[in-house]
């Protein structure tokens, strides 16, 4: 088996490493650098430049130099409004997909990323002196299925078989913990890179790297800190000269480079001067930009970003079920962790000095190389247990989301559950796949839909449809539905078009907390309405089957109570439905008692509708009713 290289495909910079014996080695590129700018440029003579060569000519060729393409990976055109606005290159809509247009030719984000991956592949081949065809590529822990699939596609375009997609903070933990002998060490990996932020809590011990929880924001990174400085400079210049530099691609690129340089300088200095002569020109002559920026001013400009860092950290700690005092180390990963304010916030939250023993620019690629070594057998006694960041489920009766796989579940994993039809002679069901944390389906993200047909006609509740969710080691989801009677099966692999974007992920979790009370009330109303629907169905069925066996003096009150329940059901109010259900159940209990006495055979009478619909339903619980077209047959069928 050949070498499996490890690639950190970053927003700002990329890095490649490989196992050399028992140790990982970061590989220098042809220019002698250990990291490569994630930039691709197209020159007027048709030449394609990648990495440092692209960065050197970015100012003079701004419209044809592509950077931060990672932020477009696996996302629709209408999901990237902010990215489009700040990019000097042209982003166009091709059938709903975001594409980069260069000289009337369109490139997908996967194609641009593949060009960067090809550079990393060539770097490794030059170092090893042999062809490289396999790689482990890292992604932010909070990348969704579409973004992960897009990354795999980019690897394929680059001529690489992607053996594994692993999360960046997990890769960093592998690199940090490979030679650590301490058992059961709890580590927080704080990964703030060029475009994304991840926080993962892991437990390391005896070669096992177990992720306890992960959280983050796929729209928070060095680019966003740069943008605060860019906007500040542009606004200051507009005040002074009345010209918006953001409308000029070349000026915007100069602002970007100056902002990045200023941010870096402010990590070691308290102030810096930004001097951009001849930034633009008017009829009056050339204009120059000279601004002094202090560290305090920068921290004020980026205060919202700093605030946004803390919330995911607190959620990750809570979800990992650990106390801050139990965390042994906080490992800093990503170039943006060099910002003093970031380090200050980390120290303040975790009550300890952050661990700076790893190279924040290289550690992720090193971890990917170690994972490659695990796959080839070069590295033994290492077990990696990662997690899925968000819950996955399907839409169920009344528009409720029923979770099959909870957030922070260890992957790979598979979960199965058996459902049934909700109507007589129903011959097909729809599986509506969802991702998110809200109780109601409409508040979560649709990943896909598919139908299972040709179900033999039968009374409702009879057919058994097994729905299975399967997340592979790359974090990519596969869903299937199977009619257990006929063996007919339908499946779907979630494609890149229908996935969550970064803002939606963060919004889901924030909304879940902000609207918890409202969600609980809505869910209770739906569950109560579902229970009433089942009770109405059962009552009408019993009335028809028992007919004249029901005493006349009881039948009329029952029918009246049933009518009141139907009216309450129409209102959708749980407060109205519950007493109406209690009234119907009380009358039915009385009727059932009389029927048993008449038959002189206790226990041989016909069960009342309350028993048929289940005590769970009369109390507002509907675990037995789970889809607009499904209900669970038997709790014992779950988790097969």
Curated annotation (Swiss-Prot):
MF (Gene Ontology): ATP binding; ATP-dependent protein folding chaperone; unfolded protein binding
Organism superkingdom: Bacteria
Q: What induces it?
A: By stress conditions e.g. heat shock.
Q: Does the keyword Nuclease apply?
A: no
One Pfam match, given by its short name, reads: HSP70
Keywords of the record: ATP-binding, Chaperone, Nucleotide-binding, Phosphoprotein, Stress response
The keyword Cell cycle appears for this protein: no
- Which PANTHER family does the record associate with it? HEAT SHOCK PROTEIN 70KDA (PTHR19375)
Protein name per the record? Chaperone protein DnaK
User: What species is given as this protein's source?
Assistant: Prosthecochloris aestuarii (strain DSM 271 / SK 413)
